[in-house]
Structure formats: C-alpha cells, structure tokens
C-alpha cells in the first residue's frame, strides 16, 4: 500500500494551503509550476513548510479535512512544532461507533 502524506504550503502572502498526496516532492513541483491546485496559481513564491505521513487515503482525507478546520494560529503551531499532529491522527484512527 502506498503511504499518503499531509502537507502545508505557505504562499507569498503568508496563507497556508493544506493538501494530501502520495508523493510530496512531485506534488510540490506541480504547485510550483502552476499545474497543481487552482487555489495556489498566481500566489507568488510557494514554500513547503510541513509534511507528514498519515497512512492510507481515507485517513489522509480525514486529516486534511480536520487540519483545514484549524485556525491560522493552530496551523502555525503545527508548522512550527508539529503541535497536536500525533493526537489528531490518533483521534482519526479511533473507530467510530455507529448506532442504529
């Protein structure tokens, strides 16, 4: 199984973009060349500031959603310290209990 990664890219105007991929370097190069996400096109210099393996695609999608819900301050802490990332992944791996 190919591992998936969560990554954050900082734009020239100091915004943070969150994405997932199986190959961080390839995806970063796509963003740099303007062939990645439309949200990053024309945003000036892009800097890869965080990446971490998250497991399979399902877990990566859930992690991406959760990180996108964080405040800018929380994302900055994640970039600077990895703060809370292990806990975030752990909470996503806990099986959900379904009630009928």
UniProtKB/Swiss-Prot annotation:
InterPro entries: GIY-YIG_endonuc, GIY-YIG_endonuc_sf, UPF0213_domain, UPF0213_GIY-YIG_endonuc
SUPFAM superfamilies xrefs: GIY-YIG endonuclease
Gene Ontology biological process terms in this record: DNA damage response
Highest taxon of source: Bacteria
Entry GO MF terms: 3'-5'-DNA exonuclease activity; DNA endonuclease activity
Residues in GIY-YIG domain copies: 2-77
Membership in a protein family: Belongs to the UPF0213 family.
Protein name, UniProt field: UPF0213 protein YhbQ
UniProt organism field: Escherichia coli (strain K12)
Protein encoded by which gene: yhbQ
